[in-house]
Amino acid sequence: VMKKSRISLLWQVLLAIATGIALGQFLPVPVARIFVTFNGLFGNFLTFAIPLIIIGLIIPAISDLGKGAGRLLLVTAAIAYGSTVFSGFFTYFSGRAVFPELITESAHTAAIIDNPGNMALKPYFTVEMPAPLDIMTALLLSFCIGLGLSAVKGDTLRMAAADFRDIVSLLIAKVIIPLLPLHIFGIFLNMTVSGQVASIISVFVKIIVVIFILHILLLLVQFVLAGIIGRKNPLRLLKNMLPAYATALGTQSSAATIPVTLAQTIKNGVSKNIATFVIPLCATIHLSGSTMKITACAMAIMMMSGMPVNTTDFSGFILMLGITMVAAPGVPGGAIMAALGILEGMLGFDETAQALMIALYIAMDSFGTACNVTGDGAIAVIVDRIDGKKENLMQHS
């Protein structure tokens, strides 16, 4: 077991996709159905767990924001949210322009994603696992309680929420993430047997290329803005952040990259106080790269399966996604786990679409994370400038 867990999640998922496709060519149906049965159970368990994940992550995230370091915290959170939402809309409109050329809706794929019942292999049995709460109920409840906790002085519920967050984080880290590769293996096995894996893989490759280009453009926009506001050279700022970018590619975790991000941000001339405050905070709340990937993948999967992609649905989705990303834990695959709720609740993604979404997301987890942490450096420059202005005003008055 120890050996296996040393392989990063990315490689586990890529391995799962490859073996799923390879074994799908010749695995006898009765054997393949065992994996498909696991998919049914795991998919149902995810449906059950998603509202709990939402409540466990969002309540403490919001209540902590409310009671924290006051003004500076709100400024940073607002900028991080704005950056995340901008990333979502930037991706959405780029996707509208580019994807229709790249993604042809194949009737076969559409039939599969719209209705997994059309898959070639059926599970031996299924166990219904109804969710304790509806997705929207969970979101609203989390906002009400989270905002309430930040206003009320009560510690009992706040500590309970923190404990519940720890439980949910354990659930994600010890149960869901380790089983994900097996889940993805089963989905790709089933799609191979059903004969439409080639069309899906070709779309995957195209999307990954598009997102790679988009995330570079996004970083340029973020740093040009930071350069204008902070009156510094944007390209020099960006060049200084490259070690953080490279580290994040390797670790695939914003949290693990903090020391490097911090050092490079200070090198960019951000005051030490601000940097030590903004960088760890942004590692958790600023996920513009993840938002970009989730938005683009969601669009692609919807286009592939012939679901209508319209701006009103996506606007609501992106605004919610921003909040969900603020709450998402900084572990590999954490963002997509937190986002499953609104993918299901607002865009109507079923289990198969969700599994494709997870596979596609994790397949490029590294440069999404790299985009997140590099952008943190830009936010630090902006917050430093805003804070500097405030201090000057205080001194003059």
Question: Predicted segment positions?
Answer:
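Signature of multi-pass transmembrane helix bundles
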Residues: 3-28, 40-49, 71-236, 396-397
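Membrane-water interface of transmembrane alpha-helices in multipass transporters/channels
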Residues: 34, 70, 74, 197-205, ...
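Short amphipathic alpha-helical coupling elements at transmembrane boundaries
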Residues: 36-47, 159-174, 239-247, 263-267, ...
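Transmembrane alpha-helical segments and their short flanking loops
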Residues: 103, 295-397
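Transmembrane helix-bundle signature of multi-pass membrane transporters/permeases
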Residues: 41, 45, 58-59, 76-81, ...
